[in-house]
A protein has these predicted regions:
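Electropositive, beta-rich accessory/interaction domains or terminal extensions
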Residues: 1-106, 113, 146-163
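Loop/turn positions that initiate beta-strands
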Residues: 83, 133, 137-140
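Active-site glycine-rich loop that binds ribose-phosphate moieties when present
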Residues: 109-116, 120-130
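Solvent-exposed, well-ordered amphipathic alpha-helical segments
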Residues: 118-119, 143-145
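A structural signal for small-residue-enriched, beta-sheet-centric alpha/beta enzyme cores
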Residues: 123-124, 140-142
């Protein structure tokens, strides 16, 4: 399965194992070096922000607003398993865990109910460890190398929430 990195304005993002916790909203160790979020979920968050009256109906949600430092096109939680590798032209990342809802997420979106909506929707994104350091640029196409496929991101997300 192939996927594409999402919109990014600026130079290529450098990724290395020493970057543990480069996510702006969810710091962590080496297993959380990169937080990736599916672009497909952005319309949902734009709609619920408008419903919560923290944004206008036509107000776009800027890329990176969900705390991610990598936006994925054509790939979401249903297709990510712990240990899968995302192979890009210049680096390799390994799926490590789902993001759990936290107050920082609600603050980033401008309304506290966002935390519950993440839990309910399962639109959590995923953290990645760096296997081979390198850089990522907008529009790069990558592929998934399947891992053991024992635990999916959505299933682990639900289990950690006790659902």
């Amino acid at each position: 399965r192939f996927w594409k990195s999402g919109p990014w304005r600026g130079p290529p993002m450098s990724i290395s194992p020493a970057d543990g916790g480069i996510s702006r909203y969810c710091p962590g160790g080496a297993s959380r070096a990169v937080y990736a979020y599916p672009a497909a979920h952005y319309p949902f968050w734009q709609t619920v922000r408008a419903q919560a009256r923290v944004a206008a109906w036509n107000e776009p949600l800027p890329w990176g607003s969900l705390g991610e430092n990598l936006t994925l096109e054509g790939l979401d939680e249903r297709h990510l398993w712990i240990g899968d590798r995302l192979v890009l032209p210049d680096c390799v990342l390994a799926v490590s865990e789902p993001r759990l809802p936290c107050a920082k997420f609600g603050a980033a979106l401008g309304f506290a109910q966002a935390v519950g909506l993440m839990a309910q929707s399962g639109f959590c994104g995923a953290f990645f460890a760096v296997v081979e350091p390198g850089s990522v640029s907008a529009g790069q196409t990558g592929r998934i190398e399947p891992g053991p496929r024992e635990v999916g991101i959505r299933e682990l997300f639900r289990a950690r929430l006790g659902r």
